[in-house]
Amino acid sequence: MEYIYASLLLHSAGKEITEDAVKAVLSAAGVEVEDARVKALVAALEGVDIEEAIEKAAMPVAAAAAPAAAPAEEPKEEKKEEKKEEDTTAAAAAGLGALFG
């Protein structure tokens, strides 16, 4: 993630995203730089409109946040699921006991 953050920092500062620039940002942050990862990142970002990518990534988050109101029945459903999980765990434990006699 640090490599992507470094490229985003360079982009927001209006700097060109080059191998040397990414290495400099990572080194300044105290990150041990791997040349292969830097080269792969710079190559992957060639021709990518970072602003457009950020906008596309932010859109689903905003859309997903809209349905915040939840019905009051959801906690009851969760309790049923928890009971099923407990039953499954108990059955698994019983099965393991049969293995060891």
UniProtKB/Swiss-Prot annotation:
GO terms for biological process: translational elongation. Coiled coil: none annotated. Keywords: Ribonucleoprotein, Ribosomal protein. Disulfide bonds: none annotated. One of its GO terms (molecular function) is structural constituent of ribosome. Residues 65-89 are annotated as: Disordered. The keyword Ribonucleoprotein applies. InterPro entries: P1/P2_N_sf (IPR038716), Ribosomal_P1/P2 (IPR027534), Ribosomal_P1_arc (IPR022295). GO terms for cellular component: ribonucleoprotein complex; ribosome. Gene3D superfamilies: 1.10.10.1410. Residues 73-87 have a biased composition (Basic and acidic residues). PANTHER family: 60S ACIDIC RIBOSOMAL PROTEIN P1, LARGE RIBOSOMAL SUBUNIT PROTEIN P1. Belongs to the eukaryotic ribosomal protein P1/P2 family. NCBIfam families: ribo_P1_arch. Forms part of the ribosomal stalk, playing a central role in the interaction of the ribosome with GTP-bound translation factors. Part of the 50S ribosomal subunit. Homodimer, it forms part of the ribosomal stalk which helps the ribosome interact with GTP-bound translation factors. Forms a heptameric uL10/P0(P1)2(P1)2(P1)2 complex, where uL10/P0 forms an elongated spine to which the P1 dimers bind in a sequential fashion. This is Large ribosomal subunit protein P1. It comes from Methanothermococcus thermolithotrophicus (Methanococcus thermolithotrophicus). The lineage of its organism: Archaea, Methanobacteriati, Methanobacteriota, Methanomada group, Methanococci. The gene is rpl12.
